[in-house]
Curated annotation (Swiss-Prot):
<comment type="similarity">
    <text>Belongs to the ECM29 family.</text>
</comment>
<feature type="repeat" description="HEAT 15">
    <location>
        <begin position="1202"/>
        <end position="1239"/>
    </location>
</feature>
<feature type="repeat" description="HEAT 5">
    <location>
        <begin position="355"/>
        <end position="392"/>
    </location>
</feature>
<dbReference type="GO" id="GO:0005634">
    <property type="term" value="C:nucleus"/>
</dbReference>
<feature type="repeat" description="HEAT 13">
    <location>
        <begin position="1089"/>
        <end position="1127"/>
    </location>
</feature>
<feature type="repeat" description="HEAT 18">
    <location>
        <begin position="1467"/>
        <end position="1504"/>
    </location>
</feature>
<dbReference type="GO" id="GO:0005829">
    <property type="term" value="C:cytosol"/>
</dbReference>
<feature type="repeat" description="HEAT 6">
    <location>
        <begin position="394"/>
        <end position="431"/>
    </location>
</feature>
<dbReference type="InterPro" id="IPR024372">
    <property type="entry name" value="Ecm29_N"/>
</dbReference>
<feature type="repeat" description="HEAT 20">
    <location>
        <begin position="1600"/>
        <end position="1639"/>
    </location>
</feature>
<feature type="repeat" description="HEAT 14">
    <location>
        <begin position="1160"/>
        <end position="1198"/>
    </location>
</feature>
<feature type="repeat" description="HEAT 12">
    <location>
        <begin position="1023"/>
        <end position="1060"/>
    </location>
</feature>
<keyword id="KW-0677">Repeat</keyword>
<keyword id="KW-0963">Cytoplasm</keyword>
<feature type="repeat" description="HEAT 11">
    <location>
        <begin position="884"/>
        <end position="921"/>
    </location>
</feature>
<dbReference type="InterPro" id="IPR011989">
    <property type="entry name" value="ARM-like"/>
</dbReference>
<feature type="repeat" description="HEAT 4">
    <location>
        <begin position="314"/>
        <end position="354"/>
    </location>
</feature>
Length: 1679
């Protein structure tokens, strides 16, 4: 065996040795190398040695032949299969050699082998794989695993030990490798699991091309799955700089920018928050680089906020400790970051509330005082998170000492406010120390007003409950807390706050606000314990308590009983008493209430002497209340004390005069007497009062003074008298009063006169109160009738106060002493005497109202009678006669319900409630059924029907009565405001029954209908029930708040609590849709409101079949003529939009067939409708449509794909529609406002690029597929080609660019056609549009066929040569954009672009040559590029030199000049010479001087070529051009000819004499003064060039010419007009003449030079003199 193997090896070795050419050697290696290497596995040592020898020989030959290519596919295949180490080493050596010699052709088989095994042999195959990818196009035939993609992605990182990628990373081709790998990953069908990682790493690449491409791919689809644990772990490893790929056994360094990017991604991942590595990130904060700390702090907050509490809880204490250490160390100075840390503390406590300690609270409150304002916001947020856990705090007694110092030691600090919040939340409401803190805060001298208001929430139970509901963490616990919340016992409060104090000194030593707060809080406690259901204790400032106590006898009794039951009521009464002595309003009113509740034995203890002394000094506003209090107190005293006080008061009255002081005292004394004797009579009787009055004459004098005051013109006297009469007539009979000589009739007549004549409303009101109470003192029907008529005549008085006073008076007349208003004025323990009084005026009063008033056609009387009837039913005790007239009362109230007066309706509804309260048993049930049937049957009783027809008089205006519908229309037309017709007609559109429903509500809302009866009513087995449900639900969303409220009450009362509204949604929606088209705006608006309520929080799929109808009607009402309807419709439209968007977002995440199907259904209904209304005339509709479509597109749902073209069309057109009008205006008037058009164009382009429409368009591009692209193309083509708005065209160009960038393969088939459209439109008159189209063409060149690209670019570039500046600019920009966006195509079309750039950069337009010069500098290699494209450049120049357009011909000449200067013309000298020679024959034209300069440069550059055969021709050309008459051209010609004649190769050209003849004239002063063609600077330049030409044309041996030249110069100097610049030119060119002059000539020449040097301001004059005469130039010149 060994011999055979050796023989084979020898043969192979021989063939290899005999291989003479490199090709034959490579062929043999391809055949024999792999089989030879297999022999390394031979068991025979001799074979192995021979194999090694041959392998070494081959390797030596390969090292000497760098072009040899190895059979890598066979080598790699053998390597991955080899087991023998020796063979592997040799295989590796050959693979290493062959890897660097890979041919530039695809080898997909080798690539697939490498991809299959790269993770097994990364050091061998990874770099080879990347090299192979560079020369291969992505194809689905090549497969790759996720792990391999992960390994390949690491190519963009730096390996810490630099073992794997070092060759490629430092290669000159590294950018190509990086780009090719990116493209493969993006375009191939490889698994997408790790593609994002390659983009992610490459986005931070140091090579901008790579980073830019990676960013494009990332935007397209390259985001990690942030809920994929493997992705998240990689990101966390990157953030921690611990990224490792196990398959490569390598760790990689990651830049800080990438680590920050990784954290930015993690800030969106919930799963990341639940990993141990996330906790490591938190621990890493202090050690992290400063630039990473902000992101890590944000991530910490994210982790704490999003982590599973069960995961985070064991680590919470450590994290809290870490955060506190960071904050205390002050390493983090940023306010924002410190704020994040404080917020994180709050979030941590949500995870583990055991972290909440008083120490932590103290720390946070202290920080709140010391940190900057921006950080305090976050601390406050953290404290707000912590607060709810204190609502069930375990150590309340330990907490209060922590909080109090922050509140009282620094009341102005933010910590004080926060500490107060904890006081409000952490303690039960009945915890007195906490309430006491709130009370102590009520001191305006120490605490700010807002702080006081916050503390008041801790003194009001309902506000406290509402405040605590915000901080609820557990709904059930919160309900228990609210249920258990109660005011503390009033006795406990009094004992806690007042028992240990001298109450008089307490008032004097503390702020009044603090004392008053205590009083108010104790009163709330009393009322709370009396009856919690009434919630009197929570009425702000107890403002309504007096009115309620007047109207509710039971409540008065309950409060009285509660006061008596207080063990320390005396202490509280004394406290209020001393507050009253200080003349504060609140204590005075409170004491008035309390003495009415208190039994006589309690009131007896109050020191009346102190009060009597003070009462005369009370302000007028409190005087009546104070004297009433004193009257009650005195009435409980013994007879002696009463007699003494009354005697002193009588004395004051008798000694009074007209001085103010005495008058007020007398007035006060009258009040004291009146109240005292009244309450004495209330306790006993009127006859017993006589025993307290020692002198009967005094009482007569008292009544006499009262009557005198009543008739006085002084208002105070009158009101005082009325107040006393009002009280007296309640308790004293007519007989008792007349026994003292009082004329009862006279008093009544005075009062009736006042009602008619006095203008003061308050006096009239008091008169009504008095005359109604006069009826209590007699039973005379005739007198009662007189009083009744006096009350009746007040109905026409237009004052609400008088109206309500008349109703009270009417009820008192009817009800007598048992009337609620009468009983409420008497102290509760004195009311027993009132029960003995009787009155029988009830029947005739009720009859009068029902018969003479209710059915009156007078609106004011009906208004008054409705209130009178209500007051009698509500405030008089029911009698037998009430039941007799019950049916009449009922129908009267129903008749009031159909009145158009809201007040009458409300009154009637209250009357129905009052009737309901009067009835019992079957009568109450019958009443309830009747009302319900009235609504359900949609009818009104025949007696109450009030129909409207065309001739019904509805209301009146200042133009008269509006009687008919026709009159309404006329009035609206004449008013000039047609909108009014809707307001007017809405009245006719609402039946009287509708108005009745509003009134019925209050009555029905109080009916306690059983649930069974409700279910029976709404059983929906009849159309009546269904109709009722629809109407009730719609009516309770009426635009009128009162109607809506009352209808809501009806709904709550009539509709079963367990009604399943969802099952009836369809029918309710149909009803609303019907009424949204109603002529009545109220129907339309209520229907809109109903839909908002009905569809809120309902998935759109529940009403998808009705969605289009709903949306259609909502858009219709959005453009309603009534503003309130429009305003109501906007929330409905937003609701529908939000529902569609949310439903579509859910289906975006649900990729199951059912989810996709649901998404398609939603889109198929919503989008066609929205697109149809995208061009609606109503601005609001368009705006809403736009916002909805935008949000739908943002969901990225694939079901939108088929609608994307239409959406894109709308967005493109919206770009123009919603462009700022200012931009359009300025575009038309730019010149008028001296604004550069370029600035306007840039602003408009920027606005388009940054607009929300472009964002939507970009999202749409991501949703396109082949089918939708087919639809989009004609739309896009039309947008580009048709005339339209500038923004739309710019947007269309942007779309084309985005399509190429993001969806290149998709747009490729349409690229050619789009290119044609853009080509036709790119020369738009608007520069911004042209620029955008040119840019789009640049992008399209990437994906269109090369032939089309060449043709298109050629046609656009050809426009340059037409000479139009705008077209030239566009052509230039296209070239730049092609080089920038399609560099490969640009290079392939280099023969087109480079010659054009070279030609165009010589344009005389700055905007053109600037662009193209920069492009030439960046893209070309100067002379090399010129030489490479010399043939194309010459043809281009030659073509444009023969045209007649100077703005094209001149650049051609300039280009030719540069071409001559920079190119190598070894083989093209004759062609250039012929071209120059022919073009020089033309007459002078602007720019020909450049041609002459090019001609001279060519002559100087190639003298041998010229001298051989062209000298004579050159002589003719130079002479001809020298003699041209065009003065401007001649100046340049002198310079060029001078340059040629100065060249040593052309010394034989003798043009000395010609030069003097042509140039001498220009040195004459006569020419200088007369020539008008040139300006001064041009004349000086011409003279300089003349000097230059004459001096350089000088030749030796021509004495005459020398003399002529010196004469010209001397004469010019003699005339002393030469500019110093011309003199400097003479000095500069002097050496030419010095060489050829004789000594005699030189003397004259030296004088000329001296005169040129003398006084020449240029420093160069000295330098030129030194060149001619050496260092001693000055002495030489002077001599």
């Amino acid at each position: 065996m060994a011999e055979n193997e050796l023989r084979l090896l020898n043969n192979a070795e021989l063939k290899l040795a005999l291989a003479e050419s490199e090709d034959s050697f490579q062929s043999l290696v391809s055949v024999f190398l792999c089989p030879i290497l297999l022999k390394l596995d031979s068991p025979h040592e001799s074979v192995r040695n021979k194999t090694i020898s041959i392998a070494n020989h081959i390797m030596t030959r390969l090292n000497n032949n760098a072009q040899a290519i190895l059979p890598l596919e066979a080598l790699v295949s053998q390597y991955v299969e080899a087991n023998q180490p020796l063979r592997k080493r040799f295989l590796l050596a050959f693979i290493s050699i062959g890897e660097k010699r890979i041919p530039c052709s695809e080898n997909l088989a080798l690539l697939q082998i490498c991809l299959n095994h790269v993770n097994e042999y990364p050091l061998v195959l990874l770099t080879l794989t990347i090299r192979l990818l560079r020369f291969s196009k992505p194809t689905s035939a090549i497969t790759c695993s996720n792990d391999v993609i992960l390994s390949l992605s690491s190519f963009y990182l730096i390996q810490k030990d630099q073992r794997i990628f070092s060759d490629l990373q430092f290669s000159q081709k590294t950018v190509d490798y990086r780009l090719s790998l990116l493209r493969w990953i993006h375009l191939s069908s490889w698994p997408s699991n790790w593609k994002w990682l390659a983009y992610f790493f490459a986005s931070a690449d140091s090579h901008s091309e790579v980073a830019r491409l990676a960013d494009e791919f990332t935007r397209d689809s390259g985001l990690p799955d942030l809920e994929n644990l493997s992705h998240v772990n990689v990101l966390l490893d990157i953030a921690l700089d611990k990224f490792r790929i196990e398959a490569l056994h390598a760790n990689f360094s990651v830049s800080i920018s990438l680590r920050n990017k990784a954290i930015q991604h993690l800030l969106k991942s919930k799963i990341a928050a639940n990993t141990d590595k996330a906790i490591n990130c938190i621990e890493f904060i202090l050690e992290a680089p400063p630039s990473m700390q902000p992101r890590l702090i944000q991530f910490t907050r994210w982790v704490v906020d999003k982590a599973d509490p069960n995961f985070l809880k064991p680590k919470a204490a450590m994290i809290l400790e870490k955060i506190l250490s960071i904050l205390s160390s002050n390493i983090i100075q940023s306010d924002l970051l410190r704020g994040f840390l404080y917020t994180t503390i709050g979030l941590l406590t949500k995870v583990d509330n055991h972290l909440i300690t008083n120490s932590l609270l103290t720390n946070l409150l202290t920080s709140l005082q010391s940190e900057l304002p921006d950080v305090r916001v976050s601390i406050d947020e953290a404290l707000s998170i912590i607060i709810p856990y204190y609502s069930n705090f375990r150590f309340s007694n330990e907490l209060l000492p922590v909080l109090e110092p922050f509140i009282f030691d620094s009341p102005e600090s933010p910590a004080a406010y926060c500490a107060l919040r904890f006081v409000l939340v952490a303690f039960p409401f009945d915890y007195l120390p906490a309430r006491f803190i709130c009370l102590k805060v009520q001191n305006p001298f120490v605490f700010h007003h807002s702080f006081i208001e916050e503390a008041k929430k801790g003194l009001n139970l309902s506000q406290w409950v509402q405040y605590n509901s915000v901080y609820s963490t557990n709904e059930a616990q919160e309900e228990d807390k609210v249920r258990a919340a109660s005011y503390p016992s009033a006795s406990e409060v009094i004992s806690f706050i007042l028992s240990d104090h001298d109450l008089k000194k307490f008032w004097e030593s503390n702020a009044a606000e603090y004392c008053l707060a205590i009083l108010e809080f104790i009163e709330r406690c009393i009322y709370y314990s009396a009856d919690r259901s009434l919630e009197l204790y929570d009425n702000d400032k107890l403002s309504s308590i007096d009115a309620l106590l007047i109207q509710d006898s039971k409540l008065r009794e309950m409060v009285s009983e509660k006061c008596i039951s207080l063990s320390n009521f005396n202490v509280f009464l004394e406290y209020v008493f001393y507050g009253t002595l200080l003349m504060h309003f609140e204590p005075t009113y409170a004491l008035s209430r309390l003495v009415s509740f208190a039994p006589p034995e309690v009131t007896f203890s109050l020191p009346e002497l102190d009060f009597l002394t003070s009462v005369f000094n009370f302000p007028l506003a409190l005087r009546n209340t104070a004297t009433r209090i004193l009257g009650i107190i005195l009435s409980t005293k013994d007879s002696t004390r009463i007699s003494e006080v009354l005697s002193s008061c009588f004395t004051i009255i008798s000694t009074s005069n007209n001085k103010n002081d005495n008058f007020f005292k007398a007035e006060t004394a009258l009040l004291i007497i009146g109240y005292t004797i009244s309450y004495l009579a209330a306790q006993t009787n009127s006859a017993a009062v006589d025993s307290f009055i020692l002198n009967s004459g005094s009482i007569k004098e008292f009544f006499s003074v009262l009557l005198e005051y009543l008739g006085s013109n002084v208002l105070h006297k009158k009101t005082t008298s009325l107040a006393i009469y009002k009280e007296l007539f309640v308790y004293f009979t007519r007989d008792w009063i007349t026994s003292y000589g009082v004329d009862f009739d006279e008093i009544l007549n005075v009062l009736l006169r006042f009602l008619k004549e006095v203008e003061d409303t308050n006096v009239k009101v008091e008169c009504l109160h008095v005359i109604s109470r006069m009826s209590l003192s007699f039973s005379d029907d005739e007198m009662a009738e007189k009083i009744l008529k006096a009350i009746y005549v007040t109905y026409h008085m237009d004052s609400p106060d008088i109206l309500f006073a008349s109703a009270e008076a009417m009820s008192i007349l009817a009800g007598g002493h048992r009337n609620v208003f009468v009983k409420s004025t008497c102290p509760i323990f004195f009311q027993k005497q009132l029960d003995n009084y009787k009155a029988d005026h009830y029947c005739f009063t009720l009859d009068f109202i029902l018969t003479d008033c209710v059915n009156s056609p007078k609106p004011l009387l009906r208004r008054a009678s409705s209130l009178w009837l209500f007051y009698i039913v509500r405030y008089c005790e029911p009698q037998t006669y009430t039941m007799t007239r019950l049916n009449d009362i009922y129908h009267s109230f129903l008749s009031f319900l159909v009145t158009q007066d809201d007040f009458v309706q409300d009154t009637a509804s209250r009357g129905l409630k009052a009737m309901y309260d009067v009835l019992e048993g079957d009568e109450r049930k019958s009443f309830t059924d009747n009302l319900i049937s009235t609504i359900a049957a949609d009818r009104v009783d025949e007696k109450t029907k009030a129909p409207l027809d065309a001739d019904t008089a509805l209301f009146t205006t200042n133009k008269g009565t509006v009687a008919t519908y026709k009159d309404i229309c006329s009035l609206a037309s004449e008013s000039g405001n047609p909108d009014l017709i809707y307001s007017f007609l809405s009245i006719a559109g609402n039946s009287s029954l509708w108005q009745a429903r509003k009134g019925l509500a209050s009555g029905i809302s109080y009916l306690g209908i059983p649930e069974d009866q409700k279910r029976k009513t709404f059983s929906f087995d009849t159309s009546k029930s269904s109709s009722l449900l629809k109407k009730l639900y719609r009516f309770k969303h009426d635009p009128n708040p009162d109607v809506a409220k009352t209808m809501g009450e009806i709904w709550d009362t009539l509709v079963p609590s367990d009604l399943n509204l969802a099952s009836h949604r369809k029918y309710l929606v149909e009803d609303c849709l019907e009424f949204m088209g109603s002529r009545s705006w109220r129907d339309r608006e209520s229907s809109v409101n109903t839909l908002v309520s009905l569809l809120s929080n309902v998935p759109v799929t529940e009403y998808l079949n009705q969605l289009e109808d709903i949306w259609n009607m909502s858009f219709r009402t959005l453009d309603d003529i009534k503003e309130s309807v429009r305003e109501a419709s906007f929330p409905l439209c937003k609701l529908l939009a939000r529902s569609v968007i949310q439903s579509l977002e859910k289906t975006s995440h649900n990729t199951s067939p059912s989810g996709i199907c649901k998404g398609k259904r939603i889109v198929s209904v919503a989008l066609p409708f929205l697109l149809k209304h995208a061009y609606d005339q109503a601005k609001e509709v368009r705006s809403l449509t736009y916002s909805t479509i935008t949000e739908l597109v943002r969901t990225g749902n694939s079901t939108l794909t088929s609608f994307v073209p239409a959406i894109m069309q709308v967005m493109l057109e919206y770009l123009t529609e919603y462009e700022s009008k200012a931009a359009t205006f300025l575009d038309f008037h730019a010149k008028n406002y001296s604004i550069k058009q370029e600035n306007i164009d840039n602003a408009r382009t920027s606005a388009v690029q940054s607009s929300s429409m472009m964002d939507t368009l970009e999202k749409c591009i991501g949703l396109l597929d082949e089918s939708s692209m087919q639809t989009l193309y004609p739309i896009l083509n039309r947008m580009i080609a048709k005339p339209g708005g500038v923004p739309t065209k710019i947007g269309s160009a942007q779309v084309v660019m985005l399509l190429v960038i993001r969806r290149g393969p998709l747009v490729k088939q349409f690229a050619s056609k789009l290119l044609q459209s853009l080509k036709s439109s790119c020369f738009d008159r608007n520069a911004a549009v042209s620029d955008a189209f040119a840019s789009a063409i640049g992008y399209l060149l990437r994906v269109c066929p090369l032939e089309i690209a060449s043709q298109t670019c050629q046609e656009i570039i050809d426009k340059f040569y037409d000479g139009n500046t705008n077209e030239q600019i566009i052509s230039s920009k296209l070239t730049v954009y092609a080089s920038r966006y399609a560099p490969d195509v640009f290079l392939n079309l280099g023969s087109l672009f480079f010659p054009f750039i070279f030609f165009g950069k010589h344009s005389s337009s700055i905007s053109i040559n600037g662009v193209l010069s920069k492009a030439w500098d960046e893209l070309s290699s100067a002379g090399s590029s010129v030489n490479l494209y010399s043939e194309e450049i010459i043809l281009l120049i030659q073509k444009n030199l023969i045209v007649t357009k100077w703005d094209v011909k001149r650049p051609a000449a300039a280009a030719l000049l540069e071409f001559v200067n920079t190119s190598r013309l070894t083989y093209r000298q004759n062609d250039i010479y012929v071209l120059l020679n022919e073009t020089m024959k033309d007459k002078s034209w602007p720019g020909k001087e450049l041609l002459l300069e090019a001609y001279v440069k060519f002559l100087i550059k190639y003298p041998e070529f010229i001298k051989s055969q062209k000298m004579e021709e050159v002589h003719q050309v130079i002479v001809r051009e020298f003699k041209r008459r065009n003065i401007v051209y001649k100046s340049h010609a002198m310079e060029s000819v001078g340059e040629l004649l100065s060249d040593e190769n052309y010394r034989e050209l003798d043009l000395y004499e010609l030069s003097l003849n042509e140039c001498g004239t220009f040195l004459q002063k006569e020419w200088f003064d007369k020539d008008d063609e040139l300006n001064l600077e041009e004349k000086i330049a011409l003279q300089r060039n003349s000097v230059y030409a004459m001096f350089n044309s000088s030749r030796p041996g021509n004495k005459n010419c020398n003399e002529m030249l010196l004469t010209y110069l001397s004469n010019a100097l003699d005339e002393n007009y030469l500019h110093w610049n011309v003199k400097l030119a003479i000095l500069k060119n002097a050496p030419h003449l010095k060489k050829i002059m004789s000594n005699e000539e030189f003397l004259l020449y030296k004088d000329i030079l001296y005169r040129c040097y003398e006084d020449n301001p240029s420093p160069k004059a000295k330098d030129y003199a030194e060149v001619i005469f050496g260092e001693n130039y000055l002495s030489v010149l002077r001599n």
